[in-house]
């Protein structure tokens, strides 16, 4: 095989590896994220139906009616202590699972649950809540459950992707140079650093909970807007489905971005382990390739200067 042919072969192999990671991201989205968001959408729909069900004699309800306070005996029927206890038990399970998740992720999970518990405790102390507020609390509980599962599932997925990418790049490098040698298996702590310590100080965990906060606020605002406009149950349901679609699109972007990032980080770490000093940036040139990637295609960089997600 000539030098040009050999380079072409290895270039294709690198691009094939990138394509494999893209396919892995799509499989994860279909088998995991799509199912979770569909279930959350169903549960949120049920909460909206409960709100409208309080006024079953009407096709629509006003914002004034939705803001009517639940007091006295009806308020006492709400099992606030049970809901708070359930949240605390979930926090305890998260803490007991320490070792399966990084401390940073565990702290983020606990923080979100504690904030919701404090809010429910405040309603208990106040002794009253509106029909709308009650449904908003229940919807936030559903969303928190959704993003808890996202945190855990996405971490496990990225952990697996890093290890797979690292070993594949070590193998490819050894194949390229024509001999094998011993290499260090990445520790759990090293994998966590790769996943959580991005150059831009962002990571999947922080981004997910930003999504959760934004989505909860979005749902609250859209419920109020729909009620002010006197929308029917069907129109309100369509409004919330639309917002769920926006949230799912954000989740898809995150999975794809983090998959690309972790592939590049695993490749960099494998190159360093194998003593590679330089690498060539290769981009799949098609209609989806960004202008920045087009400009970097074919350029060479020192491995020690590599910044996954940037070059």
Q: Where are each of the predicted segments found?
A:
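N-terminal leader/targeting and assembly helices and adjacent pre-domain segments
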Residues: 1-241
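Acidic, glycine-rich two-metal-ion catalytic cores of nucleic acid-processing enzymes
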Residues: 245-311
